[in-house]
Amino acid sequence: MHRIWICFFLLALESSISTIAQQTAYAKFSSAPAVSTANILASIVGGVLKLPVGKVLNIWGRAEGLCASLFVYILGLIILAACDGPSSYAAGYVLYWVGYDALYLILQVFIADTSGLRNRAFAFAFASTPFICTAFTGPLAGQNFVDNTGGWRWAYGAFCIIQTAAFLPLAGVFKYYETKGLKMGLYQKERSGRTVMQSLVHYFIEFDGMHVFLLIKGISHANMS
């Protein structure tokens, strides 16, 4: 549980620092009004994609879902750290937010998997305590990054390393217990028997790809108009 708490803490801290870095970045780009556009788009895409992310966890496994989400999250941070304009920043921010939401969902699913119904509310409350302290310490750390640690880009670059070091061991723990469960016969993996093309069609239907796309497009148009 302590490792889960650390991961929640790092997500909360990075999110708080990112707020300061974002304002500084758009000020440098002389494109401050684009902040709200990037935030709206990232929130819509990240929120809608929670639906297929939950499906990924059930089909591929917790460890695989965590690694895929971490990859998207880190890729977004790298683009944010290396971007040269508001458009590339917005693209990186969408990837970053999709990965962030997915990682947060996976941690919540793990808590639900490992806690009893009687203690689940307490477990979720305990895991959310980092957001209390980072609400005050995060902006101070973000301002320190901007003023004394090489600028706002390092606010993102540093967490590429920190988050990878924090989350990859957790994926290893997930995989270890999954393998242990297989050896103990607690559950069995069955081969699908589908071809590659059949698998693509199957997963597109399972993840409800068309409706996810239409939902993102519809909500985006409604918020941008």
Predicted regions and their residues:
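Hydrophobic transmembrane alpha-helices of multi-pass solute transporters/permeases
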Residues: 1-21, 29, 201-225
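Short intrinsically disordered, low-complexity coil segments enriched in acidic
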Residues: 1-7, 54, 153-156
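Internal alpha-helical transmembrane segments of multi-pass membrane proteins, especially GPCRs
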Residues: 2, 37-40, 67, 125, ...
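Extracytoplasmic
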Residues: 2-40, 46-50, 103-104, 108, ...
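Hydrophobic alpha-helical interface/terminus motif in multipass membrane transporters
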Residues: 22-25, 110-111, 145, 225
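Membrane-interface helix termini in secondary transporters
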Residues: 24, 51, 55-59, 144
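Helix-loop-helix hairpins in multi-pass membrane proteins, especially solute transporters
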Residues: 58-210
